[in-house]
Amino acid sequence: MPDARPPCSILILAGGRGQRMGGRDKGLVDWRGEPLIAHVHRVVRPLSDDLVISCNRNQADYRAYADRLVGDAEADFPGPLAGVIAGLKVARHGWVVVLACDAPLVDRELIEGLLRLAVAGNSAAMVRQGGFWQPMFSVLPKRVLPALEQAWAAGERSLQKALLREAVQGLECAESDRRLSNFNSPERLQD
C-alpha cells in the first residue's frame, strides 16, 4: 500500500538556555552514548527531506543533524514560540512536525498519528497527556505562521497559548506514555 502521508517538514527545537541542565545545551547532552539530538534525529530523518533545527548556539554541532539551522530573531533565548516562528518561516512543506530535542523516546507511530490527525482535521494537532496540552509534540499547518507572529507581536511568549488561539486537534496519550518523556534535567538522564 502506498504511503498516504503528505510531505512534512520536521522542526526540532534546540534553542533553549538549558537552565535545568546547569546551562548545558540539552540537545548535545549524552544519553546512552550519544547526544539527545541523535536519538530524535534517528526517528525523524526517514520522515522528511526537510529537517530544520532551531538552535541559538553550537550550530556547528547541530549541523550534522539538519538540512537547515535557524535561530531566534531576538537574542537572549526568548523561548519555543520564537523557535517555531523561525522554523515555520523556512519550512518547505505545508505541514510541520514540531518536537523538542530532549525527547529521545519519541517514535514514528506518535509522529504519524499526529500528522494523520492534523491532516484529517485540516488544523494543528497536539498531544494531550493527562488533560494537559504538550506543544512540544505537535504538527502545525504552515499557514498558522501569521497568527503566531501576531500573537508574538501582541506580547504572547507561550507556545501553547499561541497555538490554542487556533483550531487544534488533541491526540490523547496516557500519563505513563514514556514516548513523551523530556530529559530536561540531569536526574532524568538516569532513567
UniProtKB/Swiss-Prot annotation:
GO cellular component: cytoplasm
SUPFAM superfamilies: Nucleotide-diphospho-sugar transferases
Catalytic reaction(s) noted: Mo-molybdopterin + GTP + H(+) = Mo-molybdopterin guanine dinucleotide + diphosphate
Highest taxon of source: Bacteria
Subcellular location: Cytoplasm
Keyword Cell wall biogenesis/degradation belongs to the record: no
Taxonomic placement: Bacteria, Pseudomonadati, Pseudomonadota, Gammaproteobacteria, Pseudomonadales
GO molecular function: GTP binding; metal ion binding; molybdenum cofactor guanylyltransferase activity
UniProt keywords, alphabetically: Cytoplasm, GTP-binding, Magnesium, Metal-binding, Molybdenum cofactor biosynthesis, Nucleotide-binding, Transferase
Record-linked CDD domains: MobA
GO BP field: bis(molybdopterin guanine dinucleotide)molybdenum biosynthetic process
Disulfide bonds: none
Cofactors: Mg(2+)
Domain text: The N-terminal domain determines nucleotide recognition and specific binding, while the C-terminal domain determines the specific binding to the target protein.
Family affiliation: Belongs to the MobA family.
Name assigned to this protein: Molybdenum cofactor guanylyltransferase
Binding site for Mg(2+): 102
Enzyme class, broadest EC rank: transferase
Coiled-coil intervals, chain numbering: none
Gene: mobA
Record note on quaternary structure: Monomer.
Keyword check for Protein transport: no
Enzyme Commission number, as recorded: 2.7.7.77
General function of this protein: Transfers a GMP moiety from GTP to Mo-molybdopterin (Mo-MPT) cofactor (Moco or molybdenum cofactor) to form Mo-molybdopterin guanine dinucleotide (Mo-MGD) cofactor.
Binding site for GTP: 13-15, 26, 72, 102
